[in-house]
Amino acid sequence: MLFPFLFWYGTWFGRKLSDSEITEYLNNAAAKPRKAQHALVQMGEHISRGDTRVQQWYPKVVELSENPSLELRQTDAWLMGQDHTYQPFHEALRKLLVDSAPMVRRNAALSLTNFGDPAGRGELLAMLHPYTISTPVAGTVKYRLKIGEYVNPGTLVGRVGTEEIRSPIPGEVLGLKKRDGAEVRAGEPLVELSADKEHAWEALRGLLRVGQKQDLDDVQRYARGVAGMPDRVRRQAALTLQEIRSRAQ
Protein backbone atom coordinates (compact mmCIF):
# COMPACT_ATOMS: atom_id res chain seq x y z
CA MET A 1 0.00 0.00 0.00
CA LEU A 2 1.06 3.60 -0.51
CA PHE A 3 1.98 4.34 3.06
CA PRO A 4 5.65 5.30 3.23
CA PHE A 5 5.06 8.33 5.44
CA LEU A 6 5.61 7.57 9.12
CA PHE A 7 6.41 11.20 9.82
CA TRP A 8 3.86 13.97 9.56
CA TYR A 9 4.89 17.48 10.48
CA GLY A 10 7.57 16.23 12.87
CA THR A 11 5.40 13.68 14.64
CA TRP A 12 6.86 10.19 14.93
CA PHE A 13 4.17 7.54 14.62
CA GLY A 14 6.29 4.72 16.02
CA ARG A 15 5.46 5.40 19.68
CA LYS A 16 3.24 2.64 21.02
CA LEU A 17 -0.21 3.79 22.09
CA SER A 18 -2.39 2.27 24.79
CA ASP A 19 -5.93 1.19 23.96
CA SER A 20 -7.29 4.21 25.80
CA GLU A 21 -5.03 6.53 23.76
CA ILE A 22 -6.19 4.96 20.50
CA THR A 23 -9.80 5.51 21.55
CA GLU A 24 -9.08 9.09 22.58
CA TYR A 25 -7.19 9.94 19.38
CA LEU A 26 -9.85 8.45 17.11
CA ASN A 27 -12.66 10.26 18.93
CA ASN A 28 -10.80 13.58 18.69
CA ALA A 29 -9.88 13.30 15.00
CA ALA A 30 -11.63 16.53 14.02
CA ALA A 31 -9.45 18.62 16.32
CA LYS A 32 -6.19 16.63 16.08
CA PRO A 33 -6.10 14.63 12.84
CA ARG A 34 -2.41 13.72 13.05
CA LYS A 35 -2.99 12.00 16.40
CA ALA A 36 -5.84 10.07 14.81
CA GLN A 37 -3.47 9.12 11.99
CA HIS A 38 -1.02 7.85 14.63
CA ALA A 39 -3.82 5.70 16.06
CA LEU A 40 -4.62 4.27 12.62
CA VAL A 41 -0.98 3.32 12.08
CA GLN A 42 -0.96 1.54 15.43
CA MET A 43 -4.16 -0.27 14.51
CA GLY A 44 -2.50 -1.54 11.35
CA GLU A 45 0.26 -3.05 13.47
CA HIS A 46 -2.35 -4.72 15.70
CA ILE A 47 -4.09 -6.22 12.65
CA SER A 48 -0.80 -7.56 11.27
CA ARG A 49 -0.29 -9.41 14.56
CA GLY A 50 -3.79 -10.89 14.47
CA ASP A 51 -4.92 -8.89 17.51
CA THR A 52 -8.73 -8.97 17.41
CA ARG A 53 -9.05 -6.23 20.04
CA VAL A 54 -8.63 -3.77 17.19
CA GLN A 55 -12.11 -4.62 15.92
CA GLN A 56 -13.68 -2.46 18.63
CA TRP A 57 -12.54 0.62 16.66
CA TYR A 58 -13.68 -0.55 13.21
CA PRO A 59 -16.90 1.53 13.14
CA LYS A 60 -14.85 4.65 13.92
CA VAL A 61 -12.43 3.79 11.09
CA VAL A 62 -15.35 3.71 8.64
CA GLU A 63 -16.53 7.07 9.98
CA LEU A 64 -13.07 8.60 9.45
CA SER A 65 -13.18 7.77 5.74
CA GLU A 66 -15.24 10.98 5.39
CA ASN A 67 -12.88 13.15 7.45
CA PRO A 68 -11.81 16.40 5.71
CA SER A 69 -8.11 15.70 6.40
CA LEU A 70 -6.49 14.30 3.24
CA GLU A 71 -3.70 12.60 5.20
CA LEU A 72 -6.22 10.95 7.49
CA ARG A 73 -8.36 9.65 4.60
CA GLN A 74 -5.24 8.36 2.88
CA THR A 75 -4.18 6.44 5.98
CA ASP A 76 -7.74 5.26 6.55
CA ALA A 77 -7.91 3.85 3.02
CA TRP A 78 -4.65 2.00 3.67
CA LEU A 79 -5.87 0.57 6.98
CA MET A 80 -9.20 -0.68 5.67
CA GLY A 81 -7.36 -2.93 3.25
CA GLN A 82 -5.69 -4.76 6.12
CA ASP A 83 -8.83 -6.71 7.09
CA HIS A 84 -10.87 -7.97 4.15
CA THR A 85 -13.30 -9.80 6.45
CA TYR A 86 -15.08 -6.62 7.57
CA GLN A 87 -17.70 -5.76 4.95
CA PRO A 88 -18.22 -2.10 6.00
CA PHE A 89 -14.55 -1.49 5.08
CA HIS A 90 -15.29 -2.83 1.60
CA GLU A 91 -18.23 -0.48 1.18
CA ALA A 92 -16.32 2.55 2.47
CA LEU A 93 -13.37 1.85 0.16
CA ARG A 94 -15.63 1.78 -2.88
CA LYS A 95 -16.85 5.25 -1.97
CA LEU A 96 -13.26 6.49 -1.68
CA LEU A 97 -12.62 5.59 -5.32
CA VAL A 98 -14.24 8.93 -6.21
CA ASP A 99 -12.36 10.94 -3.57
CA SER A 100 -11.00 14.29 -4.75
CA ALA A 101 -7.43 13.33 -3.75
CA PRO A 102 -5.46 10.96 -6.03
CA MET A 103 -3.49 9.47 -3.12
CA VAL A 104 -6.73 8.51 -1.36
CA ARG A 105 -8.17 6.97 -4.55
CA ARG A 106 -4.99 5.02 -5.16
CA ASN A 107 -4.87 3.57 -1.66
CA ALA A 108 -8.56 2.70 -1.91
CA ALA A 109 -7.98 0.91 -5.21
CA LEU A 110 -5.07 -1.04 -3.77
CA SER A 111 -6.98 -1.94 -0.62
CA LEU A 112 -9.92 -3.18 -2.68
CA THR A 113 -7.68 -5.76 -4.33
CA ASN A 114 -7.36 -7.42 -0.91
CA PHE A 115 -11.12 -7.95 -1.11
CA GLY A 116 -10.72 -9.41 -4.59
CA ASP A 117 -12.66 -6.40 -5.89
CA PRO A 118 -11.59 -5.04 -9.31
CA ALA A 119 -13.60 -1.81 -8.92
CA GLY A 120 -10.37 0.20 -8.67
CA ARG A 121 -8.76 -1.21 -11.83
CA GLY A 122 -9.00 2.11 -13.62
CA GLU A 123 -7.11 3.81 -10.82
CA LEU A 124 -4.46 1.07 -10.78
CA LEU A 125 -3.92 1.47 -14.52
CA ALA A 126 -3.68 5.25 -14.11
CA MET A 127 -0.79 4.68 -11.69
CA LEU A 128 1.18 3.20 -14.60
CA HIS A 129 0.81 6.35 -16.70
CA PRO A 130 1.93 9.99 -16.45
CA TYR A 131 -0.24 12.31 -14.37
CA THR A 132 -1.25 15.83 -15.36
CA ILE A 133 -1.59 18.60 -12.77
CA SER A 134 -4.20 21.15 -13.84
CA THR A 135 -4.95 24.59 -12.45
CA PRO A 136 -8.17 25.05 -10.46
CA VAL A 137 -8.18 28.81 -11.15
CA ALA A 138 -7.50 31.29 -13.94
CA GLY A 139 -4.56 33.70 -13.90
CA THR A 140 -0.87 34.10 -14.68
CA VAL A 141 1.22 30.96 -14.18
CA LYS A 142 4.64 31.16 -12.51
CA TYR A 143 6.49 27.86 -12.23
CA ARG A 144 8.71 26.91 -9.29
CA LEU A 145 10.36 23.82 -10.80
CA LYS A 146 12.07 22.53 -13.92
CA ILE A 147 11.81 19.51 -16.18
CA GLY A 148 13.63 16.56 -14.62
CA GLU A 149 13.00 17.59 -11.02
CA TYR A 150 11.27 15.15 -8.68
CA VAL A 151 8.26 16.17 -6.63
CA ASN A 152 6.55 14.62 -3.63
CA PRO A 153 2.95 15.06 -2.50
CA GLY A 154 2.59 18.65 -1.36
CA THR A 155 5.54 20.02 -3.34
CA LEU A 156 4.87 23.54 -4.64
CA VAL A 157 5.02 23.38 -8.43
CA GLY A 158 4.03 26.97 -9.06
CA ARG A 159 1.39 29.66 -8.65
CA VAL A 160 -1.51 30.81 -10.77
CA GLY A 161 -2.17 34.34 -9.67
CA THR A 162 -2.05 34.10 -5.89
CA GLU A 163 -3.16 30.44 -5.83
CA GLU A 164 -0.47 27.91 -4.84
CA ILE A 165 -0.43 24.81 -7.04
CA ARG A 166 0.96 21.76 -5.25
CA SER A 167 1.53 18.26 -6.53
CA PRO A 168 -0.95 15.71 -5.18
CA ILE A 169 1.32 12.75 -5.98
CA PRO A 170 5.03 11.93 -6.41
CA GLY A 171 6.76 11.83 -9.78
CA GLU A 172 9.39 13.34 -12.05
CA VAL A 173 8.49 16.46 -14.02
CA LEU A 174 8.22 15.37 -17.65
CA GLY A 175 6.89 18.61 -19.05
CA LEU A 176 5.62 22.11 -18.32
CA LYS A 177 2.44 22.54 -20.33
CA LYS A 178 2.43 26.34 -20.42
CA ARG A 179 4.98 29.06 -20.95
CA ASP A 180 6.08 30.67 -17.67
CA GLY A 181 4.10 33.90 -17.33
CA ALA A 182 1.29 32.75 -19.62
CA GLU A 183 -2.36 33.42 -18.88
CA VAL A 184 -4.29 30.21 -18.17
CA ARG A 185 -7.92 29.29 -17.67
CA ALA A 186 -9.25 27.12 -14.86
CA GLY A 187 -8.90 23.44 -15.71
CA GLU A 188 -5.99 23.85 -18.12
CA PRO A 189 -2.97 21.49 -17.72
CA LEU A 190 0.18 22.88 -16.11
CA VAL A 191 2.60 20.02 -15.36
CA GLU A 192 3.02 16.43 -16.52
CA LEU A 193 4.55 13.97 -14.04
CA SER A 194 5.99 10.53 -14.69
CA ALA A 195 4.62 7.44 -13.01
CA ASP A 196 6.35 6.94 -9.65
CA LYS A 197 8.33 3.70 -9.26
CA GLU A 198 6.69 2.76 -5.96
CA HIS A 199 3.22 3.53 -7.26
CA ALA A 200 3.88 1.52 -10.42
CA TRP A 201 5.14 -1.44 -8.38
CA GLU A 202 2.12 -1.36 -6.08
CA ALA A 203 -0.26 -1.02 -9.03
CA LEU A 204 1.29 -4.06 -10.71
CA ARG A 205 0.93 -6.04 -7.49
CA GLY A 206 -2.72 -5.04 -7.33
CA LEU A 207 -3.30 -5.97 -10.96
CA LEU A 208 -1.83 -9.40 -10.26
CA ARG A 209 -4.96 -9.98 -8.16
CA VAL A 210 -7.62 -8.21 -10.21
CA GLY A 211 -6.11 -7.43 -13.62
CA GLN A 212 -8.03 -8.47 -16.73
CA LYS A 213 -7.17 -9.36 -20.30
CA GLN A 214 -7.66 -5.80 -21.52
CA ASP A 215 -4.93 -4.65 -19.09
CA LEU A 216 -2.23 -6.77 -20.73
CA ASP A 217 -0.82 -4.03 -22.98
CA ASP A 218 -0.07 -1.74 -20.03
CA VAL A 219 1.46 -4.56 -17.99
CA GLN A 220 3.48 -5.86 -20.92
CA ARG A 221 5.01 -2.43 -21.46
CA TYR A 222 6.40 -2.58 -17.93
CA ALA A 223 7.48 -6.22 -18.37
CA ARG A 224 9.65 -5.11 -21.29
CA GLY A 225 11.21 -2.45 -19.08
CA VAL A 226 10.38 1.23 -18.71
CA ALA A 227 13.14 3.86 -18.59
CA GLY A 228 13.79 5.06 -15.05
CA MET A 229 12.03 2.12 -13.41
CA PRO A 230 14.05 -0.31 -11.24
CA ASP A 231 14.34 -3.95 -12.26
CA ARG A 232 12.00 -5.09 -9.48
CA VAL A 233 9.19 -3.23 -11.24
CA ARG A 234 9.96 -5.12 -14.46
CA ARG A 235 10.02 -8.43 -12.57
CA GLN A 236 6.71 -7.67 -10.88
CA ALA A 237 5.20 -6.81 -14.25
CA ALA A 238 6.35 -10.18 -15.61
CA LEU A 239 4.68 -12.00 -12.71
CA THR A 240 1.50 -9.97 -13.15
CA LEU A 241 1.49 -10.63 -16.89
CA GLN A 242 1.76 -14.37 -16.30
CA GLU A 243 -1.05 -14.38 -13.73
CA ILE A 244 -3.46 -12.34 -15.86
CA ARG A 245 -2.81 -14.58 -18.87
CA SER A 246 -3.46 -17.70 -16.80
CA ARG A 247 -6.81 -16.29 -15.65
CA ALA A 248 -7.77 -15.34 -19.20
CA GLN A 249 -7.34 -18.89 -20.53
Question: Across the structure, where does each feature detected by a protein language model lie?
Answer:
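Short inter-helical turns and helix N-cap capping residues of alpha-solenoid HEAT/ARM repeat scaffolds
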Residues: 30-32, 68-69, 100-101, 132, ...
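Extracytoplasmic/periplasmic/luminal assembly and interaction segments
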Residues: 34-82, 86
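Amphipathic alpha-helical scaffolding segments comprising HEAT/armadillo-like alpha-solenoid repeats
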Residues: 12-27, 49-66, 85-98, 117-130, ...
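Conserved hydrophobic register position within alpha-solenoid helical repeats
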Residues: 36-39, 76, 108, 203, ...
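Alpha-solenoid repeat junctions
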Residues: 43-50, 80-85, 112, 116, ...
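Short beta-strand-turn/beta-hairpin segments enriched in glycine/proline and small hydrophobics
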Residues: 117, 128-141, 155-175, 192-193
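Acidic, glycine-anchored pre-beta loop/turn
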Residues: 143-152, 176-188
